[in-house]
Amino acid sequence: MSGLKLRIGLPKGSLEEATMELFEKAGYIVARSNRAYRPAIDDNELEVRLVRPQEIARYVEQGFLDCGITGKDWILENNADVHIICELKYNKSTSSPVKWVLAVHENSPVRKPSDLQGKWIATEAVNLVKQYLNKIGVEAHVEFSWGATEVKVPELVDAIVDITETGSSLRANHLRIVDTILESFPQFICSHKVWADQEKRRKLSSMALLLQSALNARNKVGLKMNVPKENLSAILKILPSLRNPTVSPLADGQWVAVETILDESKVRDLAPQLKEMGAEGIIEYSLNKIIY
């Protein structure tokens, strides 16, 4: 693709490390220095920019970036008109979505969202919260929070809407969740103009395939072994696989090689059982990508 160059915005901050690990698994090497906002990547058709995820969707819509990875939450918060290439189910420390939650101090009299009528709410996602309140018919004062939102309750505001992945920060600050207003995964996005270009669309579709295949391989491993033919049927009955295990005859005609893909968590119990059933040369190996 001679001459193709796409400016891609990757999230700076809490999602940065997980995103770099995902790109590495997908086959890309992104070289960063401590203060670099334009890291190098081993793909001549890409130029990487590290940008706050809150801003990526807006910059893609306006054409300053061609594509990027940012949360569904920030696309909605910015009301950005962008093309979603695919959803990427990963986050900072888990494979679960982050949640925007309405929370109050554990001793607050507020038990349900309607109890916040006329109260003050602090959040970084002002538009999301206003849309939520409008939907449930509650009028409250919503103010923008520049950070450390959890510590503002109850002295400065009555409630907050903040992002959480595990809930540990909320518990540490003695907060209680009243409602969840949104769940969000990162989205791989581009502008409508970029998606309309066939060459760029092919490039982005290939990237999406590689990124999703890297996510598919999470927590899965390959397992291969040699099995006596007479034990094959019994072993296949207990052996998980994506579809069916691969079975190949060995040169002596008495043994077969068996290979399969399975959840890593199952190997601990399965490997000793396979050994007892006559399998030999059992090898577990890691995976970078699974393309369905």
From Swiss-Prot:
GO terms for cellular component: cytoplasm. GO terms for biological process: L-histidine biosynthetic process. One of its GO terms (molecular function) is ATP phosphoribosyltransferase activity. Keywords: Amino-acid biosynthesis, ATP-binding, Cytoplasm, Glycosyltransferase, Histidine biosynthesis, Magnesium, Metal-binding, Nucleotide-binding, Transferase. Its cofactor is Mg(2+). Feedback inhibited by histidine. InterPro entries: ATP-PRT_HisG_long, ATP_PRibTrfase_cat, ATP_PRibTrfase_HisG, HisG_C, N-reg_PII-like_a/b, N-reg_PII/ATP_PRibTrfase_C. Its main location: cytoplasm. Its EC number is 2.4.2.17. It is an enzyme of class 2 (transferase). Pathway: Amino-acid biosynthesis; L-histidine biosynthesis; L-histidine from 5-phospho-alpha-D-ribose 1-diphosphate: step 1/9. It catalyses: 1-(5-phospho-beta-D-ribosyl)-ATP + diphosphate = 5-phospho-alpha-D-ribose 1-diphosphate + ATP. It is found in: Cytoplasm. The keyword Transferase applies. NCBIfam families: hisG, HisG_C-term. Catalyzes the condensation of ATP and 5-phosphoribose 1-diphosphate to form N'-(5'-phosphoribosyl)-ATP (PR-ATP). Has a crucial role in the pathway because the rate of histidine biosynthesis seems to be controlled primarily by regulation of HisG enzymatic activity. Belongs to the ATP phosphoribosyltransferase family. Long subfamily. This is ATP phosphoribosyltransferase. It comes from Methylacidiphilum infernorum (isolate V4).
